[in-house]
């Protein structure tokens, strides 16, 4: 990691729009992108592939430390996630993997093992780091910190529509319950709870467009970086 490399962190709960916003901001600035949530999901898939149990943290640590993951961007600006040579882009976005990733993220030593890997993404000309503890733990000295949120109902609705477009039949009530449970787990865990970083700009995306969110971030960043 280069200490002088500027970093913009975008934290927030699942479904707030962090991934979409982060990709757009990274594209407009010509910076690198880190999807921290994807790394935890990739680790969750790796744990499944290697048939490891969540009852014991110990064997998960070396897997996290040596996780063979790559991020590739296609011509449409979409991220492709490669685990051990396999394209797991779609697999890691399932609700099952998302729930497992949240549980994996609660292990302190697993988080520590992934910490250096995430920080290694900070290279010139700059990095957009999307996650849940980017501004509080991974890049605490980042000059620009964003906390992006939205109501649980709005986030459930967005997820429902995403899955519906893919032909996946889901119950929106169950989605809402899952989101609320995940919020409670993430906000109350002892290690790296989901909270706004000190000095972060909080943006509620419930009733505003992606373009408006991006513009708010770029204006805030411009004031911090110039």
From Swiss-Prot:
Reactions the enzyme catalyzes: CMP + ATP = CDP + ADP; dCMP + ATP = dCDP + ADP
Location, primary (coarse class): cytoplasm
Enzyme class label: transferase
SUPFAM superfamilies for the chain: P-loop containing nucleoside triphosphate hydrolases
Presence of the UniProt keyword Transferase in the record: yes
One record GO biological process: nucleobase-containing small molecule interconversion
A Pfam family reported for this protein in Swiss-Prot or TrEMBL: Cytidylate_kin
Compartment annotation: Cytoplasm
InterPro entries the record matches: Cytidylate_kin, Cytidylate_kinase_dom, P-loop_NTPase
PANTHER family: CYTIDYLATE KINASE, CYTIDYLATE KINASE/PANTOATE-BETA-ALANINE LIGASE
Recorded family membership: Belongs to the cytidylate kinase family. Type 1 subfamily.
Name of the protein this chain belongs to: Cytidylate kinase
